[in-house]
Amino acid sequence: MLSILLENPLLVLFLVAAIGYPLGRIKIRGSSLGVAAVLFVGLAMGSLHPELKLPEIVYVLGLALFVYTIGLSSGPAFVASLKREGIRNNALIIGMLLVAAGLVVGAQRLLGFKGTVTAGLFAGSLTNTPALAGALETIKHIASPELRELLLAEPVVGYSVAYPMGVMGVVLAISLVQKLWNVDYGEEGKRLRLAGTASEALRSMTVRIAWPGAGRHTVAELARHEKWDVIFGRIRRGDSYLLTGPQVRFQPGDLVTAVGTETELRRVAAFLGEVSEEEITVDRSEYDYRRIFVSNPRVAGRQLGELNLFENYGATVTRVRRGDDDFLPHDDMVLELGDRVRVVTHRDHMAEVTAFFGDSYRAVSEVDILTFSLGLALGLLLGIIPIPLPGGITLKLGFAGGPLIVALILGTIGRSGSMVWSLPYSANMTLRQIGLVLFLAGVGTRAGYGFVTTLAKGGGLAIFAAGAVVTCLTALATLWIGHKLMKIPMSILIGMVAGLQTQPAVLGYALEQTGNDLPNIGYASVYPVATISKILIVQILLTMLM
């Protein structure tokens, strides 16, 4: 059997993926390794024979795909995180990552770890695969050819031993702190919703206009003056229907449909009149609605307000669904391939509006090879450019940092002329998963034999203990400083801690604890900065310690 595996690396790749992926979904006390289990299966497979390893191009390709797709989807969130409280939140995260780096260096000095193992310890205790990738890239550039294979295995040892506690330690820290501080997530959620911080599910409501002064202002003027965060749909005026547009004026007695959060809809209804139990959307004889896929490249990457839907088609978009989330469609919202827009328009115009957006499921399942390859090539080129740092240190972003930074920029831009940089949501997630599996399987098999050899020499327990200390102290310090000194609500803060770890398992635990979506706000606001910072820090650590 071993000889068959040695002669068929492609078989090894898919065996590792097929065994590792389901293992990663097994939960123990609410936590699981996720796709990282592929790494451990790869290590086990590679430990069987020194030549049982996948070609280097496998993990390099996987790495490039993984970080590039992350960057494309995180670009807008990254830019948004630099505004308002995002600057404060990201400053805390960067500070804590520097603290973690200091703790790792202290462990290295105290316990005598190699610089390469220390870099893996940093990536594992903070459960960040791109950081491990960045470490491996740096070693490839600075290590001598005869030592390269041996040195490439050492960060994986540190990462693999520290990783499990990198998940469990944070969960334990959150559990301990919320009990000590008697955190009431339900009450905190209510308070934040009143302050307009929380994200609630969207719903529709029928409002009966009773305010006598409604006709003195257009809908756009009212929404701007009262700062309403809702979208108005159709109006029933007597026995006739019309669609709400920016210049439409409500009249007393109108029945109007509105889409928004429960809190905001109640506020609008109290101002304009009262909530009505009538469902005017049931009558679809004149105005109809449907969800339409955005598959037209000429629409993707453009702001919704630029499309002039009401003026050109007499249509209004009341919701945009991206992935599994619904968003209110404001004029400055940039549409992406794969978005599903809910459109209300006259039945006679529905076919025309549908053709305008595209509505082709097949089209949104495909990838624009030109823009995808060009963007990835630009990222790889950036990654090989040496960047001089103070102290004579030269930094290269490598196959991890280069594509990530370029993808963040392109994901924010959305399109350049006729070229759409973003990927359809489904295609992005598929390529991301494939890339991550390729990377983990490749790294695991290539480091497996060295992993076993290193552990056989001793030192595994010391790495595990050091990783546990780094993880727990960093998480506890973040929670204490964030909540006690910076007054960040715990519901958001534990999401930020999950973002600090770039760990979906911790985010899942946080969501279970709060019972609302507030942790998602903290997670999304710091994830891109945390990922980039870890990649840069781990490369600086390696350059200093090797």
UniProtKB/Swiss-Prot annotation:
Any idea which UniProt keywords this protein has?
Answer: Cell membrane, Membrane, Repeat, Transmembrane, Transmembrane helix, Transport
| Annotated transmembrane regions | 4-23, 30-47, 57-79, 91-113, 155-177, 372-394, 399-421, 434-456, 460-482, 489-511, 521-543
Name where it's found.
Cell membrane
What GO cellular-component annotations does this UniProt entry give? plasma membrane
* Keyword Cytoplasm applies: no
Q: Which InterPro entries match?
A: AAE_transporter, RCK_C, RCK_C_sf, YidE_YbjL
Instruction: Tell me the first and last residues of the signal peptide.
Output: none
**What molecular function does GO assign, one term?**
monoatomic cation transmembrane transporter activity
Q: Which Gene3D superfamilies does the record associate with it? A: Regulator of K+ conductance, C-terminal domain
Q: Which residues form the RCK C-terminal domain?
A: 189-274, 275-359
Q: How does it sit in the membrane?
A: Multi-pass membrane protein
- Keyword presence, Heme: no
Q: Which Pfam family is one of this chain's hits?
A: TrkA_C
User: A GO term (biological process) for this protein?
Assistant: potassium ion transport
Listed NCBIfam families: YidE_YbjL_dupl
Q: Which family does it belong to?
A: Belongs to the AAE transporter (TC 2.A.81) family.
From the Swiss-Prot or TrEMBL record, give the protein name.
Uncharacterized transporter GSU1016
Organism in which the protein naturally occurs: Geobacter sulfurreducens (strain ATCC 51573 / DSM 12127 / PCA)
